[in-house]
């Protein structure tokens, strides 16, 4: 059988762009979500509206579990010449460690069968959601240039170091339920309509970058923060992921287009893990 060129695996925190769907070259490896006694697999059967309803009605914070090494191994098997894996930040999930273990186990299997090891590389995105998807998009672009496996890895690592992730939460309830925010602070923020602007650190953790009074002002502030770290917008793809708020995503796109001529702006809806973090009305932006 003729070997296939390459495959890109993304854990299900990363939402596939439309052109990546229904193709063997891109694949989501699902995490598992839990709300009280309900277990939800974050795959194509995920129902966002039902999931958000369950979160709203629960007194407890939702939880997630990373894909098992076996789940990754199932998608690594096959006649792929090169496999790239992009995981949720290792500061936020065990997905990276699970994928690394899967890589080692797959190649141990091949060694036992006297076969050559697969070319597999696992990237810690140091991001989440569409940040992972933009990395996949970059890898596909580099593969089309005909670069070597090692050169694709080198350039992708460099791209990850220049990436910036931002997000705004409509509600702080999930943080409150998880014990990361006091009930008093959550109440004050909601009463004053304060929207915190969050972002990723260089290591892939989460930090607060600012805040705005009301969503529109918060979006303006988030765009300004992004422009401060984007000296070459004409060369950058911006990705927006929204949790049940397409009008808000369209508003953000207009604000971006008023600031600069970006290479491309892509909008997607959040899958399960990102819906859990962003919650209803949340919006994520990555450049």
Stretches with model-predicted labels:
Residues 2-7, 13-27, 31-32, 92, ...:
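Mixed-charge interfacial surface used for oligomerization/domain docking
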Residues 6-66, 71:
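N-terminal glycine-rich anion-binding loop in soluble enzyme alpha/beta folds
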Residues 23, 57-58, 79, 86, ...:
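Structured helix-beta-strand junction loops
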Residues 59-67, 87-94, 126-127:
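Short coil/turn segments at secondary-structure boundaries
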Residues 63, 85, 122, 239-240:
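Short catalytic-loop micro-motif centered on adjacent basic/acidic residues
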Residues 67-75, 221-225:
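Well-ordered alpha-helical segments embedded in enzymatic catalytic cores
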Residues 70-83, 87-114:
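Active-site cofactor/cluster-binding pocket
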């Amino acid at each position: 059988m003729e070997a296939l060129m390459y495959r890109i695996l993304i854990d299900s925190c990363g939402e596939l762009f439309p052109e990546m769907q229904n193709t063997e070259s891109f694949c989501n490896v699902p995490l598992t979500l839990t709300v009280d006694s309900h277990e939800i697999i974050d795959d194509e059967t995920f129902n966002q509206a039902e999931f958000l309803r369950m979160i709203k009605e629960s007194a407890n914070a939702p939880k997630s579990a990373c894909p098992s090494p076996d789940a990754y191994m199932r998608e690594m098997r096959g006649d792929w010449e090169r496999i790239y894996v992009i995981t949720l930040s290792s500061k936020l999930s065990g997905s990276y460690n699970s994928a690394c273990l899967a890589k080692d186990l797959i190649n141990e299997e091949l060694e036992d069968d006297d076969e050559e090891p697969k070319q597999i590389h696992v990237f810690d995105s140091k991001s989440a959601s569409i940040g992972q998807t933009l990395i996949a998009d970059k890898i596909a672009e580099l593969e089309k240039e005909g670069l070597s496996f090692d050169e694709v890895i080198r350039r992708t690592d460099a791209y990850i170091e220049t990436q910036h992730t931002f997000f705004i939460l409509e509600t702080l309830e999930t943080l409150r339920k998880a014990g990361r925010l006091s009930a008093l602070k959550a109440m004050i923020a909601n009463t004053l309509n304060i929207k915190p602007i969050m972002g990723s650190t260089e290591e892939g953790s989460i930090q607060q970058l600012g805040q705005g009074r009301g969503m529109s002002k918060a979006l303006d502030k988030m765009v300004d923060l992004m422009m401060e770290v984007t000296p070459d917008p004409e060369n950058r793809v911006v990705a927006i992921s929204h949790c049940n708020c397409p009008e808000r995503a369209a508003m953000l796109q207009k604000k971006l287009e008023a600031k600069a001529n970006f290479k491309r702006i892509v909008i997607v809806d959040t899958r399960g893990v990102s819906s859990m973090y962003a919650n209803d009305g949340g919006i994520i932006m990555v450049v």
